[in-house]
Amino acid sequence: MSSAPRSPTPRPRRMKKDESFLGKLGGTLARKRRAREVSDLQEEGKNAINSPMSPALVDVHPEDTQLEENEERTMIDPTSKEDPKFKELVKVLLDWINDVLVEERIIVKQLEEDLYDGQVLQKLLEKLAGCKLNVAEVTQSEIGQKQKLQTVLEAVHDLLRPRGWALRWSVDSIHGKNLVAILHLLVSLAMHFRAPIRLPEHVTVQVVVVRKREGLLHSSHISEELTTTTEMMMGRFERDAFDTLFDHAPDKLSVVKKSLITFVNKHLNKLNLEVTELETQFADGVYLVLLMGLLEDYFVPLHHFYLTPESFDQKVHNVSFAFELMLDGGLKKPKARPEDVVNLDLKSTLRVLYNLFTKYKNVE
C-alpha cells in the first residue's frame, strides 16, 4: 500500500526561511570580517611600531615563502627583469658562455637553471683558464653539487682575489639559483678573461629581500649594481701608467698624445693619410690595420678587413684583426679590448698605440 504523497512545502515559506538563514549568516560573516579587520589593523600597527622602515610585503613566488625562522631570501624585482639593459646583459652573457663552450656541445638557455649545480661553471672555467679541475664529472646529490661548486669557486677566487674584485657570490647563493650572484660571477669572469663581448653599462636592478621573523615575512628593497662603466670594471684589476696619467698628470698626457700622433703620422703619411684625433680616427680599425702593414713592411690584402666599415661589428672585426697582426709581429696581447677602441675609449686606444711605439719607434 503506497503512502499518500506529501504536499510540497509552500514556496513563499521557504524563501522566508532562506532569507532568514542568509541574513543570520551574513550578519555572522560581517561580524567575523570586522573582527578580522580589527585584528589585522592591530597587527599592522604593531609591525609598524616594531619595524617602521619595513615596506609592505610584495608578491613573491610560493616557494620563496617557505623560509625558516630568521632565514633570508633575495630575488630580482619583476619590473627590473623587464628592463632592456638587464635583458641585454643576460643575453650577452648567455651568448658568450655558449660561444666558449661550443666545442663541449653545451647549450645554456637559462642562467640560474643551468649553472647552479656547478657543471657548466666547471667547464667554463676550465676552458677560459686552460686548466683541469679535480672534481667529479657528474653529481646528482645536493652535497656533491655543492662540493663541486666549492672547488670551482675556490679556483675563481684564486684568480680574482689578487685583482681586487669584491666577491659577491657564494656556494649557497649560486646553488640557490640566486640570479644576482650568478650575474656578478659571470661579469667578473668576463672582465678578467677579456671576453670579446660588450657588456651594457650601468645595469642596476631592484632586489627584494624577504626575511622571516616571528613567523611573519618581511620584505625590503635594495638597489644592486651589476655593471658600471667598462673602464671602471677593467680598472678593478688593472692599473698602469695611463691610469696615473689620466688621474694625476693631464699635462703629461697631452705630451704623450702629441708624441704618439707624431709617431703614427710618420708612417701613415706614406699613404697620404694623417691623424689629428687619436680616439676617433683609430676607432674603426682601418688605420690600425694599415699601420701594422707599414710597420712590418707588408701589404694587407683588402679582403681581410673592411676598408669602409659601417656597423659596430665590422669595426670590432677590423680592430681584432689588427690585434692579430700585432701578435704575429711578436707583440704582447693588447691590454685593451677591441670593443673599447671602437667605443672611442681614449685610454684603451693610447695603450694600443703606445704598445706599437715601444717596439717600432726606431723604424723608418
From Swiss-Prot:
Keyword terms: Actin-binding, Cell adhesion, Cell junction, Cell membrane, Cell projection, Cytoplasm, Cytoskeleton, Membrane, Phosphoprotein, Repeat
Record GO cellular component, one term: lamellipodium
GO molecular function: actin binding
Region called Disordered, residue ranges: 1-57
Protein family: Belongs to the parvin family.
Function: Adapter protein that plays a role in integrin signaling via ILK and in activation of the GTPases CDC42 and RAC1 by guanine exchange factors, such as ARHGEF6. Is involved in the reorganization of the actin cytoskeleton and formation of lamellipodia. Plays a role in cell adhesion, cell spreading, establishment or maintenance of cell polarity, and cell migration.
Protein name: Beta-parvin
Source organism: Homo sapiens
Lineage, opening ranks: Eukaryota, Metazoa, Chordata, Craniata, Vertebrata
Gene designation per UniProt: PARVB
